Regions:
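Histidine-centered catalytic micro-motifs
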Residues: 14-19, 135-143
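Alpha/beta enzyme core
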Residues: 1-9, 18-135
Length: 143
C-alpha cells in the first residue's frame, strides 16, 4: 500500500484507523503512514487528550495528520457491542485544543449494519460548527 502510494501521480494519504496505543501509532508513522487515528475513545477524556497530545508530538516529526475520537461509535471495528456515548461539545473543544486535523465524534452512529434505525444527534455537529477547528469525521456511515 505504501509503495503504491509513492508511485501514484496524485497525492495519496495512507491512514491507520483506530490505533489505540502509542507504540502502534508510532510504528505506523515510522513505516510511512501519512495519517493516523488515535482512538482513545474508550479512555476517560483526560487520558484520551493526554494520549492524543503524545501522538501529536510524534506526528509532527513525520509531518503527519492526526484524527482523534470523542464519544463512542457503537459497535467496535470487530463487530463487538460498545456502549454508545454521545460526544459532548466540551470534550470536542478539549480535544480540538490538541491541534488534531480531524475529530471523529460519536453522535449515535455505529460501525457495521444497524440493527434498528439509529437516532443520530446532529445537534452535536451543529454545535461544533464554527467552534471546533478540526474536520468532523463520522464513522459507521455505511451501516
Amino acid at each position: 500500500m505504501l509503495a503504491a502510494a509513492e508511485k501514484a501521480h496524485v497525492p495519496i494519504a495512507v491512514h491507520l484507523d483506530h490505533g489505540k496505543t502509542l507504540p502502534c501509532l508510532k510504528e505506523a508513522l515510522e513505516m510511512g503512514f501519512t495519517s493516523v487515528m488515535c482512538d482513545g475513545s474508550d479512555l476517560p477524556i483526560e487520558e484520551n487528550v493526554a494520549l492524543t497530545c503524545q501522538v501529536m508530538d510524534l506526528a509532527r516529526q513525520y509531518n503527519a495528520c492526526v484524527e482523534a475520537e470523542v464519544g463512542r461509535v457503537g459497535k467496535g471495528e470487530d463487530g463487538s457491542e460498545v456502549k454508545e456515548a454521545i460526544a459532548s461539545l466540551s470534550d470536542c473543544h478539549r480535544m480540538d485544543q490538541t491541534g488534531i486535523t480531524a475529530l471523529a465524534v460519536g453522535i449515535g452512529n455505529a460501525h457495521g449494519v444497524y440493527a434498528a434505525t439509529p437516532h443520530l444527534h446532529y445537534e452535536v455537529l451543529e454545535a461544533m460548527r464554527g467552534s471546533v477547528r478540526a474536520y468532523p469525521v463520522l464513522h459507521g456511515g455505511s451501516g
